[in-house]
Regions:
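Inter-motif core of Ras-like GTPase G domains
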Residues: 139-140, 159-180
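Residue-level signature of catalytic and energy-coupling elements of molecular machines
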Residues: 34, 45, 71, 79, ...
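Walker A/P-loop phosphate-binding motif and the immediately C-terminal alpha-helix
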Residues: 36-74, 189
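Phosphate-binding loop that captures ATP/GTP phosphates
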Residues: 66-67, 72-117, 129
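Glycine-rich phosphate-binding loops of nucleotide-dependent enzymes
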Residues: 108, 132, 151, 164, ...
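C-terminal lobe/tail of nucleotide-utilizing enzymes
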Residues: 1-22, 189-276
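Phosphate-binding/switch loop-helix module in NTP-utilizing enzymes
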Residues: 114-162
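Phosphate-binding P-loop
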Residues: 29-35
Length: 276
C-alpha cells in the first residue's frame, strides 16, 4: 500500500482523512447580485469567441433579461468595439460602474479603463489575472440575470483564475470546422472537467457560407468534425454559425446589437435553462 502524501487533490481514493478541495471563489461586489455566470472559451484564437459572447448577451437581453459582459481577454479586448462603446468607465468611492450599451447591456473591459483604446496592455500573467478578479469584485454590476465572461483563448492564467474565482455555472466552447480543432477543443473541455465546470455545449463558428444565388451550403474550411467531437465528450452541438458578411459589418460598425438571425438560438436556450 502506497504511503499517503496528504495531497487530496491528486488522489483518487476515498479515506477517512480525505479533505475537501479548497474553495477559492471570491464574492462579487456587495452592491452586485449576479444570478448566472457563463464562460465563453476556445482552445485557440480567431474562432469568433468574442462575437459569440456579444451575440449571446444580445439574445438574452432581447428575451427580457438583464445581461452583462465581463471582458476577461485583457490583452486582446474586443467587446467594447463590438458594442460601439468608446467612453471610459467611471466610479465613485464604492467602486467602478460598467458602461451600458445602446440597449442596456452592461460591459466592463480593460479598454474602458485606458486613456487611448489603442494602447497595448503589456502585463505579466499574475497582473492580468488580478485585473480579472477586480472586474468581478470591484465593479458595481447591480442586478444581473446572466453575465457572460469572454475569456482569452487557451488554458492559461485567466481561464484558471475565472474557473477558480467566479461561480461559473457553465461554459460554451467555441470552435471552427477543422480536424486540428478537435485536439484544441479537447484541451478546453478537459480543463473544464478538471475544474468541475459544467459544459453547456459546443458552438461551431464559420461552419459554412450560403451561396447567395442557390442557397447551397459551402464548407469553406473543410468538412466539419464538430459532431464527432461532441459525441466523444457527450456534449450537445448548440449551434453551427455560418460565415455571414452582415455579422462582420455589424461588428465593424459597433452595431452587434442589430444582428439578425437565429444561429445561436440553441445556445441561448441552453443558457436560459440555467434559471429553470
Amino acid at each position: 500500500m502506497s504511503e499517503c502524501t496528504h495531497n487530496c487533490e491528486t488522489c483518487g481514493k476515498s479515506c477517512s482523512e480525505r479533505k475537501s478541495a479548497a474553495d477559492f471563489r471570491e464574492p462579487a461586489h456587495k452592491l452586485s447580485s449576479i444570478k448566472k455566470v457563463i464562460g465563453v472559451v476556445s482552445g485557440k484564437g480567431g474562432v469568433g469567441k468574442s462575437m459569440t459572447s456579444a451575440m449571446l448577451s444580445v439574445l438574452m437581453n432581447r428575451r427580457g433579461y438583464h445581461t452583462a459582459v465581463l471582458d476577461a481577454d485583457i490583452t486582446g479586448p474586443s467587446i467594447p468595439k463590438l458594442f460601439g462603446i468608446h467612453e471610459r468607465a467611471r466610479g465613485d468611492e464604492n467602486g467602478v460602474f460598467p458602461v451600458s450599451s445602446k440597449t442596456g447591456i452592461d460591459v466592463m473591459s480593460v479598454n474602458l479603463m485606458l486613456e487611448n483604446e489603442e494602447d497595448p496592455v503589456v502585463w505579466r500573467g499574475p497582473v492580468i489575472a488580478g485585473a480579472v478578479k477586480q472586474f468581478w469584485q470591484e465593479v458595481i454590476w447591480k442586478d444581473v440575470d446572466f453575465m457572460f465572461v469572454d475569456m482569452p483563448p487557451g488554458t492559461g492564467d485567466v481561464p484558471l483564475t475565472v474557473f477558480q474565482t467566479l461561480p461559473v455555472d457553465g461554459i460554451d466552447v467555441v470552435a471552427r470546422p477543422q480536424e486540428l480543432v478537435s485536439m484544441i477543443v479537447a484541451k478546453a473541455v478537459k480543463m473544464a472537467n478538471m475544474m468541475n465546470i459544467p459544459i453547456l455545449g459546443i458552438v461551431e463558428n464559420m461552419s459554412y457560407i450560403s451561396c447567395p444565388d442557390c442557397g447551397k451550403k459551402i464548407s469553406i474550411f473543410g468538412e466539419s468534425h464538430v459532431d464527432e467531437i461532441a459525441a466523444k465528450f457527450q456534449l450537445p452541438v448548440l449551434a453551427k454559425m455560418p460565415i455571414d458578411p452582415r455579422l462582420a459589418q455589424n461588428a465593424d460598425a459597433g452595431c452587434i446589437e442589430q444582428f439578425e438571425g437565429d444561429y445561436l438560438d440553441g445556445a441561448a436556450n441552453a443558457v436560459e435553462a440555467l434559471l429553470k
